[in-house]
Amino acid sequence: NDNSEIYKQVSLISDARMLWGGDDTINKFRKMEIPERCLDITFSDRYSIAVINSNNFVNLSNKDIEKMSKKFFYDSYLSNQMACNSPHFVFWIGEKSLSSQKKFWDNVKKIVQDKYLFNDFQIYKKYENFISNLISQNFIKIIFLDDNKVRIFEISNKINNIENIRGIYGTFFQVNL
């Protein structure tokens, strides 16, 4: 469905435009003719990460871990990892990474199982993303949690082009620093 002509006509009579999308979409709209005083407010492609200090994490109460996991779930899953606040990477710092990771991901998995519905389109796109990442990255290991609603790629700390590595529908990348 190409609405380019409609967008061009609306742009010609706009005093302001709010442009929201990836860099390609923003650039497409910027090329359209607009009135001289038209103001563009852009929300282009963003990239979010999470950094967890495992030495502090192990000292959290179960209630605080559950609260943190819920916030991670809301930032990631409610927008299918397509919002600017949705983390793609989780960087773990500290000596207690392995025990912290298990506890964190188990909590996320539990919340996902209770609150997230997965449709056929999402399953297909997640598989497509999985194959694409398998081809393009050097993974240490891949962790599937139960029914595949949470997928974690563990990557060495030598990452090239991090901005091009993206998860979708519960696919995350983690690095131990």
Residue ranges of predicted features:
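NAD(P)-dependent aldehyde/semialdehyde dehydrogenase
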Residues: 66, 70, 79-177
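Conserved NAD(P)+-binding/catalytic subdomain of aldehyde/semialdehyde dehydrogenases
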Residues: 1-90, 94-95
